[in-house]
Amino acid sequence: MKQDEDGPSFSYELLSVSSKVADRLEAALEPLGLSLAKFGALSKLVAAREPIPLSTLAERCACVRSNITQLVDRLEADGLVSRADDPHDRRSIRAELTDEGRRRQAAGLRAIEKVERELLARVPKASQETLLGLLRSLHLSS
């Protein structure tokens, strides 16, 4: 991260904002017993609308299989996800949301939306769409 005489560079500012936003989101999710990682996995399962193989969940969460296994272990221990055999592939295990998992994901979504509203309140209305578009343009393809 390069800094010039006038202050932090673009990448430093972006990382700083990203870290602060992540901290606020984690703090909003913590009372629900969720982390950003848990919320992300639950959200991918909600979007799937059906049980999905752990390998697919790992892809959608952009993490390796061993990490998703540990994450699903924690979600299962919390009663938010259950594992089910894949009827089409006996070697594969699918992750499935429980009713509590759906409720907790919905509550997490509300908590995140509240943080987003608070953050966007700092940006003039006329600039909000532009900001979102600029942020989306920075996504790097893998």
For each feature predicted by the language model, list its residue ranges.
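C-terminal regulatory/oligomerization modules of transcriptional regulators
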Residues: 1-6, 125-142
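N-terminal leader segment of winged-helix/HTH proteins
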Residues: 1-32, 78, 137
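Active-site phosphate/pyrophosphate-handling residues
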Residues: 9, 40, 118
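Pre-recognition alpha-helix immediately N-terminal to the DNA-recognition helix
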Residues: 13, 24, 40-44, 103, ...
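N-terminal helix-turn-helix DNA-binding core of bacterial DNA-binding proteins
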Residues: 19, 23-64
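Charged, amphipathic alpha-helical coiled-coil/dimerization segments
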Residues: 22, 53, 73-133
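Residues in the helix-turn-helix
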Residues: 67
